[in-house]
Structures are given as structure tokens and as C-alpha cells.
Amino acid sequence: DTPHLLNAEYIRLQYPEHVKVYEATSPDKAAQEGVALVREGHADVLMKGIINTDNLLRAVLNKEHGLLPQGNVLSHITVAQIPTYNKLLFFSDAAVIPRPTLAQFEAMLKYDLEVCRRLGISEPRVALIHCTEKINEKFPHTLDYAVLKERAASGAYGSMFLDGPMDVKTACDAHSGEVKGISSPVVGHADLLTANAVAITCNGRGVRHT
């Protein structure tokens, strides 16, 4: 609509050498155009504006013209800068996979570790988030955590620390870990909080509104 067109024109006028505006007749067309620009190497980052997420994902996941290689997993990661925490805090997956399988969880973890390392964290500290702090068959998600911990200990994910299950406070507050008697390189120093989308979405939104 007109206000957003005016905003795009304002940005173009401010940075004429760096910004090119493409017209699209619908949200789907806008998403398709953006995906095409990335595929063709004319853009490095795809950003979502006022269009709905489903419009964007239809274009990204299109088997013929999308961005996701066949057989790969699409996931989501949030990076937050929190005044009361001494470093960036990463959350995954808060949007795409509500209840990942073990294979999907491992793929997500590898993506997340790559993002952390590219942002300068050579040994990411990963907290596996859950309401309980013990592996318990009543909580199937924690059984996957046990597998991931074993693989991490064997060096499958390179130089990093991974521990859990634990709650967010324990992951980010060393005193909380001391009170609970939990000793781990991750406790109080987590770089990445990972869980299913339901848990991470709640925590991520809570942080953004704190």
C-alpha cells in the first residue's frame, strides 16, 4: 500500500547507490522475487517485511525455485542482546519445527553451531532446555538430549560444550546452578538455548518483552 511504498522510496533516496526497489503485485510475488534474487547471487540476505510468514516460506520451500536443498532441514535462530547478560544469547528453534525428531534436532544443532562460530564464538556453550533437569522417559524429548550429549562428548560437533536438560535460569545464571548443585561449563554461561519450538518461543518472547 501507499505508506509502505513511500517508505521504500525514502530508503532508496537515502542510499541510491546501494538500494534497488522491485515492484511486486502481491505478497507471494514479492517473496518469489526476493528468493530469486538470492538464488541468482544478487542478494546475500533474505529479510521478511510486512508479508506473512506463510507467503515467504512458500517461496523459500518451493521445490523447483526455492532455497532449501532437497533433504535439508529449515530451522530458525534468534540472536538477542540482553542488557543483563554479558554476551549475545542465541535461541533455536522458535518458529519452524514445533517438535523436531532427533535427526531434525541434530541438523538444527549443527546449523546453530555454525552461526555461533561465524559470529566469533569458537567454543559455543549449548544448553538443552526443559522443565526437568534429568533424563526421563516420561519426557521423550529428554531422551533425544541424552543422544545429543553422547555424540557431543565423542566430538561429533567439534569444539563445544553441551549439557542439559536444564531450565533457562540455570543456563544463564551461575548462582542458580550452584544452589541446585549442578556443575557444568554451560551453567551460567550458555551461548545457545535450544529446545522444541513451543518452549523456545515462550522464552524468546519473554526475553524480548523483559
Predicted regions and their residues:
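Anion-binding alpha/beta catalytic cores of soluble intermediary-metabolism enzymes, centered on
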Residues: 2-185, 189-196, 200-210
